């Protein structure tokens, strides 16, 4: 019970434990983390560089867009719940701020551990934000049904598995996945979905009526649009400099535009009375950038980007309409934000598209650029076909890590002392947030109501007339 | 009737037709659109460039700002309507996503069609977003009175005329218009205004009372501020590299600051009891960047930018206060967002300012920079005076294209099967969007109401007086 | 009285006076302000530069982030007040637009006045925005209790003192303060706090109940998040190119992440029933970037950044919980936004951290980079210890300028003709803004309330318990 001493004590003790988590992280930073040669005052000036050569200028603008997506985009996208806005934005803030520190360590140990130290710079900032993004995708699958302590434990585990999966794919298998269709979207989605399945709450049906407030949906659109506009930077942030980043951004731009049209088309087709559903627009329109996550750095061609984006938008919309209910009824997965439709299916499609485009790679098409997109093919160690096979194999590895990890995570989150909110408190901010005496929330009334059709039908129209006649 | 089977069927059929539109666009992309030499893996590496030379790094950060303005800025600026927020943001999203694809083709055929192909890169992304901006300006003039199918038809036509007008001005007449006072603001505004005139609805007066909700106005301010802060990037996005972009951003920055002060000054001067009007702040403060759209790349001088911005802010504010009512009563133009005040008049002023500044151009003032700002003058093909005359002529060409196009568009949009919303459903989301059982909207109550006094309508007129007399 | 002819006349006259302020500024611009050699068409092309060398490309992306923080971040952060949102965003807009022009002149005369002219470019844009930021910090201390004319007078004075203080610190004392812990945060905070003390309103207690509306807090989170994500750019905007900007952004990034965790930990620890307080999250989480404002360009080490950020987050949270009430009761300072917790204390901590890190500077740690971070030490004019002493002395100078200036400002703002809002109208938009007949505001009801239970206040305390016991 939210107000009972025991729970209060539980809450009072759990988040403060963050201090120890932060303390431990700080100690590890002290021991292992150092500036890299593009960040360190002495090392940078030792080499005889022009300042324009500093990677900062090639990657930082993209990083800032990614940073905005992680904190503004993911945070507000989840504000669509009527009385869970504080938690959606607040826990996104907390989770991402923790995940980016923790993944700086995990990814550092796996990717850039030299001479006993992790060397950090703008690339590690981008990689850490990417990992935080995967954690937030999983968060979307359990949104409203988990407390902050549970979420932090989830992040603690997921960041480690994310790093290992990424290491296996990129370094051991030589898989290409610049925009993270595999490492971020597919991994984050299925980790969260399996975890949500383990935490299945049979009595939660009713919670549905707590979703959606007119202005909450407008806040959510802030998240949608910021994710949408900056996604070209997300996919391009870590691709090869020059034409690589240029092409990646361009492909993503076209793919997103097409998925938006596909979403509107399908949403109207399947909507009641042919009306549009805001849930589709908020989410499915974003599927276009997931589907090109792997292939946007490749010679996908502008046409390929449009076709892939349109396909992703339609599939994602159909998923929200028809598959989400099945997911809950048949598979016992309560996918609060529909991450399966937004990240899961489009992610898998994106991997398959990557398999196709990689398999079609030729020296003619890439010229000397082959070295930067498919180094192993350029060096003659692999044929395009075998690269494609490795890409496909990467999908299975990712699904394996995600499922096992999500299942394990679900069991951990069931630990009794973790203060999981009771069914009656799910999707409610009040269990986690103080309501200062004067904090107010809009009075719920039916959507699109014409003033006057509220309780007292007779009086309101009058009042409006009055207001008008005064004017 | 919104819910009638016929209309429902109409809606259900129209938006899905988007799929064919998208299919046709995709086919045209497949046939004609190719990566340019800065985007293509093989072509880029063939030339022996340093990655820092890739245009991506000079223009992409500005592109991202433009992209944010188009989707966040225009979208939320139009959320000021009380129950039309879904449509304002949603249709902005749809229209812009379609327009940028379509204009990539149209502009490509006209501007960068070589060897049977359109070559795309960051410049074409910026140009496409610019064209989408013009379409959204026109959207502002018919906001709330048109359905998505009508809007898409409008975009289909407007994008073509935008491209032709732009081609005539920039390529045939050698007009300079980096920030689009002519090609974007003047064209978009008058195209939309004439179109709105053709669609005049004599019975729509009352709809006014549907405008304005406290939080809707705050959402609109999100749009205003994002448009305001990023406009220096908009004007600078396509100007010459180096000092050109630098100067353009600086001029726009000063002009915007001055137009903001001018708007507050005039809004208080003409406001009832000297109070400020949020509509003025949301819109007129932005006029400063329209007025320097043409001249911001020129040697306008910081003083010139301030003076122009201040003038634009005052003119725009007076337009909202005094001219908009006349526009509806006398000219039968129902300009929902006041695009005439925000884009029309300031756009024309901007052209005239461009005429003046171009006419004053000298080799002394521009030095070797003359080549990049006024190539025809630098090459001795034109005198500054003749360049000024061409600039002025460009205005008439633009007004001609905009008026004829807007009139034609208005007739097309009257086609009966296009599902235009009935007067009673204008400015209402419900005709276009599903209202899931739990979607809620705030209960309308008078502005600035003191809590607790909301039940009794009778006292409302009084109450405000009381509140005042307490003071 | 808001509605009385006298007040109305007062308002109607005051803001229009802005025109003269703008006119005077414009004249000064005409006489003194010129493009610098990186912005002027002739000067830039005279030197034989590659366009990539133009400072625009190194600093403009950071400038845009700073610009977004000033107008979006500060503006929306202050929307947390229930019925003061128009004024929070609107006056932020007005103040910043004036301050950046005025400070371009003041800073220009003090920093870049050569040959009778002020030379402007992207650096002056950044400096002007920084100064506007300091003015907005002071605004936060008097938010809701001052009219626009008073605020403009405050800005007029503060910008001058800001420029002088900055000149004394950076040019006379050789203090390093890239991110402005001293010049921006400490100065802005104490200037505003002393000013607020002079304007103390003993009867204002009750106004507290006007704070906080559910959606207002969500709007405020928009401000919080945009400030949070872009602060690395703020601190890095003016640091030395290359590794300097790179390192500054990285340090700020880590510090912010740690302060977020510290804030959540402490907020839960001190919150009633261990619940989180949105006020802490909105504000204290940002303290992390204030505390590294001075030292983020130095070799702070990633660990140092984490430790400093965590400390700042905890101290700031405790300030909101325990010190703000004392500040009002004992020191008669009504700090509306808690700028003492967000900018004051963290700012002073930041200065002390800078003293420490500067004192530890060695040639080994900085190598040839020492020249760009501590030129006076590199040139042998100072020892690290004496540099540290100068840093510390800079704090006292800043506090002196801020207190004297704030006191003086407070007396000026008391001038009777300045139309200060009466206590009953504090935190109310209606005194400053028109309420068009149809402008509506959400009906206030208790936070997290279950729909339908809003009428009877009696059950409200109970209700929460019930909800709990169901669990």
UniProtKB/Swiss-Prot annotation, chains A, B, C:
Residues 452-471 have a biased composition (Basic and acidic residues). Residues 1-13, 82-85, 145-148, 201-217, 271-280, 324-344, 413-471 are cytoplasmic. It is a multi-pass membrane protein. N-glycosylated. It is found in: Cell membrane; Basolateral cell membrane. Glycans are attached at residue 48. The chain crosses the membrane at residues 14-33, 61-81, 86-106, 124-144, 149-169, 178-200, 218-238, 250-270, 281-301, 303-323, 345-365, 392-412. Residues 437-471 are annotated as: Disordered. One of its GO terms (cellular component) is spectrin-associated cytoskeleton. Keywords: Ammonia transport, Cell membrane, Glycoprotein, Membrane, Transmembrane, Transmembrane helix, Transport. Belongs to the ammonium transporter (TC 2.A.49) family. Rh subfamily. This is Ammonium transporter Rh type B. It comes from Pongo pygmaeus.
